[in-house]
Amino acid sequence: MSIHQSPIKRRESKKIWVGNVAVGGDAPISVQSMTNTRTTDVEATVAQIKSLERVGADIVRVSVPTMDAAEAFKVIKQQVNVPLVADIHFDYRIALKVAEYGVDCLRINPGNIGNEERIRAVVDCAKDKNIPIRIGVNAGSLERDLQEKYGEPTPQALLESALRHVDILDRFNFENFKVSVKASDVFLAVESYRLLAKQIVQPLHLGITEAGGARAGSVKSAVGLGLLLSEGIGDTLRISLAADPVEEVKVGFDILKSLRIRSRGINFIACPTCSRQEIDVIATVNALEQRLEDILTPMDVSIIGCVVNGPGEALISDLGVTGSNKMSGFYLDGVRQKERFDNEKLIDQLEAKIRARVAEQHNRIQIEQI
């Protein structure tokens, strides 16, 4: 097997649609984020959603806590292209209202929106409009009786909570849903998802909730989601960070990219640097990451500071640079080229080569489609 292929065999699951994005089945694992603006501030919320679209978010969730927020949601929905999930708790009327306004998915827990009549109203509405539901179980808001039964959040408690909500939807013959069982503790979340994956065929929405700030939260999410994804568990994911939501999307794609599950944009392979480096690897990588954020074409680019590991990494890269005194070696598809890069102009030259390679690939695809 090529090192560029993922050996992971995904769990079989039912496919549902969130707007025009398939979730589950053979669909690519989608990356989500959530706005952190006041939903009633339409201008700020739309701006944030568009910034998430630009970095590749497949789906965006918006909290809708009030009827005023529901009215704002209507205006927001008209101004963005990405599918929107409405996050709703307690008031079933809000769910009915955003359904009128074209919501692409409802994030609710059927058991906390009222009596059976209210649940039926929401489920029937979702059926009529073909709107999927996400059951979102969270260790921080576990039902009181389950807290008393288990003493604390446990994998069995989260599983029981999830299946309780699943049973409610089953009673109404509603199958268009996905489920999450999130926790801030990696082991708790991972084991909860493992148990749930054995019990249902619906898609699973992965996340380590309240993971923390940008650095610690990214690490915690990478560990937890990496374990699950490597076992084939998971159909869509959201990285929860106390940071700019744009970072959540970037980290989500980086996790998928690291497991060769879904590649998007440039995968930079760069050495941590030492006294042997002949080029400023750190400055080069940082500059190119910023300059090439608009590139969506998957591509491996190695930037190694010296000839110890540089040639070997270049062999398995689309483009590679090996640092050398004044003029650095350049590799294309693992083959060393006669052309060399002036170290003083390395960033500009490598950016030009990458963009030329992207254009070449796009042209080839267009010709093949004729």
Swiss-Prot record:
Its cofactor is [4Fe-4S] cluster. It catalyses: (2E)-4-hydroxy-3-methylbut-2-enyl diphosphate + oxidized [flavodoxin] + H2O + 2 H(+) = 2-C-methyl-D-erythritol 2,4-cyclic diphosphate + reduced [flavodoxin]. Binds 1 [4Fe-4S] cluster. GO terms for biological process: isopentenyl diphosphate biosynthetic process, methylerythritol 4-phosphate pathway; terpenoid biosynthetic process. [4Fe-4S] cluster binds at residues 271, 274, 306, 313. InterPro entries: Dihydropteroate_synth-like_sf, Enolase-like_C_sf, IspG_bac, IspG_bac-typ, NO2/SO3_Rdtase_4Fe4S_sf. Its EC number is 1.17.7.3. The keyword Ribonucleoprotein does not apply. SUPFAM superfamilies: Enolase C-terminal domain-like, Nitrite and sulphite reductase 4Fe-4S domain-like. Keywords: 4Fe-4S, Iron, Iron-sulfur, Isoprene biosynthesis, Metal-binding, Oxidoreductase. It holds the Pfam family GcpE. Gene3D superfamilies: Dihydropteroate synthase-like, Sulfite Reductase Hemoprotein, domain 1. Pathway: Isoprenoid biosynthesis; isopentenyl diphosphate biosynthesis via DXP pathway; isopentenyl diphosphate from 1-deoxy-D-xylulose 5-phosphate: step 5/6. It comes from the Bacteria. One of its GO terms (molecular function) is 4 iron, 4 sulfur cluster binding. Belongs to the IspG family. Converts 2C-methyl-D-erythritol 2,4-cyclodiphosphate (ME-2,4cPP) into 1-hydroxy-2-methyl-2-(E)-butenyl 4-diphosphate. PANTHER family: 4-HYDROXY-3-METHYLBUT-2-EN-1-YL DIPHOSPHATE SYNTHASE, 4-HYDROXY-3-METHYLBUT-2-EN-1-YL DIPHOSPHATE SYNTHASE (FERREDOXIN), CHLOROPLASTIC. This is 4-hydroxy-3-methylbut-2-en-1-yl diphosphate synthase (flavodoxin). It comes from Actinobacillus pleuropneumoniae serotype 5b (strain L20). The lineage of its organism: Bacteria, Pseudomonadati, Pseudomonadota, Gammaproteobacteria, Pasteurellales.
